[in-house]
Design a protein with these regions (language model features):
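PRPP-associated nucleotide enzymes
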Residues: 1-191
């Protein structure tokens, strides 16, 4: 699907930009013809994503950081009714697979940062596998509301990377103008 591939491309571009902020050391490498000095990244990178919508953005990063470890967290929206009959949005997470994050650089990627709640829940779930030395939160689309939410709810100093910041959310908490449900656009509608 074209949307899926375009999100992957955005991931590749953002991964290159973030690579400019990693730590490098000069090392000698032997080529078939001579010895050369090259800059080699020193950061131990873990690429984390939120299933299912985050997979294409994650793949874009993995194309650039092919030695990175991987982490996956499930998160989905669930509408719940409170005692007064008001419908509230709740984020549910039921699955986590991750390596140790202790003293590693975590790049947590998700294409849509609408409210910031999924990113917060994913990050806090991943902390059960250690504390990263640095956190990069990466999205293709974000809202000011989500950015403010993360600034208030992510305790660790983090770097936030957004390709586009759209102005608002609609009543269903989708980014406007945005693109809709990234998971559905990438992989088809949920059953």
């Amino acid at each position: 699907m074209r949307f899926r591939r375009n999100i992957e491309r955005i991931g590749e571009i953002m991964a290159v930009e973030i690579s400019k902020h990693l730590t490098y050391a000069t090392e000698q490498v032997q080529t078939p013809l001579a010895t050369a000095e090259v800059q080699v990244p020193q950061d131990k990178v873990v690429l984390g994503t939120i299933l299912r919508a985050g997979l294409p953005l994650h793949q874009g990063f993995l194309n650039m950081y092919d030695h990175a470890e991987n982490a996956f967290v499930s998160a989905y929206r669930k509408e719940v009714e409170d005692d007064h009959g008001n419908v509230q949005l709740e984020i549910v997470s039921e699955y986590l697979a991750a390596p140790s994050l202790e003293n590693k650089t975590l790049m947590l990627v998700d294409p849509m940062l609408a409210t910031g709640m999924s990113m917060e829940i994913a990050y806090k779930a991943l902390l059960s596998h250690g504390t990263p030395s640095h956190l990069h939160l990466v999205c293709a689309f974000a809202t000011p509301q989500a950015i403010n939410y993360l600034q208030e709810n992510i305790p660790q100093e983090a770097t936030l990377w957004c390709a586009v910041i759209d102005p608002e959310l609609n009543e269903k908490k989708y980014i406007v103008p945005g693109l809709g449900d990234a998971g559905d656009l990438c992989f088809g509608e949920k059953l």
